[in-house]
UniProtKB/Swiss-Prot annotation:
Family, per entry: Belongs to the SHMT family.
Task performed by this protein: Catalyzes the reversible interconversion of serine and glycine with tetrahydrofolate (THF) serving as the one-carbon carrier. This reaction serves as the major source of one-carbon groups required for the biosynthesis of purines, thymidylate, methionine, and other important biomolecules. Also exhibits THF-independent aldolase activity toward beta-hydroxyamino acids, producing glycine and aldehydes, via a retro-aldol mechanism.
Name of the protein this chain belongs to: Serine hydroxymethyltransferase
Entry's localization field: Cytoplasm
Subunit description: Homodimer.
Pfam families: SHMT (PF00464)
Pathway the protein takes part in: One-carbon metabolism; tetrahydrofolate interconversion; Amino-acid biosynthesis; glycine biosynthesis; glycine from L-serine: step 1/1
Residues carrying the site annotation Plays an important role in substrate specificity: H228
Gene label: glyA
One Gene Ontology biological process: tetrahydrofolate interconversion
Main subcellular localisation: cytoplasm
InterPro entries in UniProt: PyrdxlP-dep_Trfase, PyrdxlP-dep_Trfase_major, PyrdxlP-dep_Trfase_small, Ser_HO-MeTrfase, Ser_HO-MeTrfase-like, Ser_HO-MeTrfase_PLP_BS, SHMT-like_dom
Superkingdom, natural source: Bacteria
């Protein structure tokens, strides 16, 4: 039998050391990658529970294995909570990722060779929305919409393309778009041409749950999301849908794409959904947006251009060309100062995808630590200081010291 005293630190010190180093990195660095956040201790406790031992192919009340009476309770809690959180008619909480959630929608509604329409990856979309190297781009005929001269979604062009190509599925959602999306307008054109309307709200889910970003659920046939990012849950996916699509979506997940669901992760999702229904969570999301607004303002004052000219969410893109820096260079520079960002292509980017002319900045993780507008302003100035002096190691060291003071004052876990 197992001995509860045989901890990871005791049985696998090499792995334990790597985990402790990552824990230290998360504490000592300011995380500004928009798709990352910190989960609560309760979410981590759920994920580290005995539920990881249980196999449960199927759905609550309809399992292919015995002994599922308690994991049925866990999954039903997750389903009921996420439906209430977003006002959905039906929900599937089993997808292991946002990408698999998207794949399930494709499996439910499409055949290879069908036409889909999504936002261009080069202008802010996601690779699962039709990128050539992704299965969505390999299996389907892809029509991409993009941005207008104001770097806002070109709704008129999107509608024109939809009428011309009549895609079977229209996707709204993005991985690098800072503004509000008019889901109702997408829904109208989808209805006009008889297309299924899908929304990938992975980046905006937490803001939507808090009522601070338009909710796509009333307008879309199906909505997918990750459960981390702004939602602050475990790594995983969900699908929300009209009741009429529940059978097709559920069959696409199991047995279509997955076998036994990760019950320990579903428990973490249930915990996160409960947390997201609180007043504290709404206040947190309000601060996420306030911090992003302050950072944009300061960076513009320091000579940097914000793509689309502003943010209306948790994320924004910074054009680095005025500083004669690439995104790759800026990511490395800021990383040395213990500020973590990711290089990101900007619209009509002349650089290669692994180099880029921009960086993406998101405020969810820093806000989880407790940063307010005061710290957001200071942090934006520190970022600009590094970008203004890319060859001055003294500046990097000074900024690193200021970051150390901030991270010590605002620990990830108190």
């Amino acid at each position: 039998m197992f001995n509860r005293q045989d901890t990871l630190a005791k049985t696998d010190p090499d792995l334990w050391a790597a985990i402790q180093q990552e824990d230290r990195r998360q504490q000592d660095h300011i995380e500004l990658i928009a798709s990352e956040n910190y989960t609560s201790p309760a979410v981590m406790q759920a994920q580290g529970s005995q539920l990881t031992n249980k196999y449960a192919e199927g759905y609550p009340g309809k399992r292919y294995y015995g002994g599922c009476e308690y994991v049925d309770i866990v999954e039903q809690l997750a389903i009921d909570r996420v439906k209430a959180l977003f006002g959905a008619e039906a929900a599937n909480v089993q997808p292991n990722s946002g990408s698999q959630a998207n794949q399930a929608v494709f499996m439910a509604f499409l055949k290879p060779g069908d036409t889909i329409m999504g936002m261009s990856l080069a202008e802010g979309g996601h690779l699962t929305h039709g990128m050539a190297l992704n299965m969505s781009g390999k299996w389907f005929n892809v029509v991409a919409y993009g941005l207008n001269e104001k770097e806002e979604i070109d709704y008129e062009a999107m509608e024109r393309l939809a009428r011309e190509h009549k895609p079977k599925l229209i996707i709204a959602g993005a991985s690098a778009y800072a503004l509000r999306i008019d889901f109702e307008r997408f829904a109208k054109i989808a209805k006009e041409i008889g297309a299924i309307f899908m929304v990938d709200m992975a980046h905006y889910a937490g803001l939507i749950a808090a009522g601070l970003y338009p909710n796509p659920v009333p307008h879309a046939d199906v909505v997918t999301s990750t459960t981390h990012k702004t939602l602050r849950g475990p790594r995983g996916g969900i699908i929300l849908m009209k009741a009429e699509h529940e059978k097709a979506i559920n069959s696409a997940i199991f047995p279509g794409l997955q076998g036994g669901p990760l019950m320990h992760v579903i428990a973490g999702k249930a915990t996160a959904f409960k947390e997201a229904a609180t007043k504290d969570f709404k206040r947190y999301q309000e601060q996420v947006i306030d911090n992003a607004l302050v950072m944009c303002k300061v960076l513009v004052e320091r000579g940097l251009r914000i793509i689309s000219g502003r943010t209306e969410s948790h994320v924004f893109l910074v054009d680095l060309r005025a500083k004669n820096l690439t995104g790759k260079e800026a990511e490395a520079l800021l990383g040395r100062a213990h500020i973590t960002v990711n290089k990101n292509a900007i619209p009509n980017d002349p650089q290669k995808p692994f180099v880029t002319s921009g960086i993406r900045i998101g405020t969810p993780a820093m806000t989880t630590r407790g940063f307010t507008e005061l710290e957001a302003e200071q942090l934006a100035h520190l970022i600009a200081d590094v970008l203004d002096a890319p060859n001055d190691e003294a500046v990097v060291e000074r900024v690193k010291g200021e970051v150390a003071k901030l991270t010590a004052k605002f620990p990830v876990y108190g």
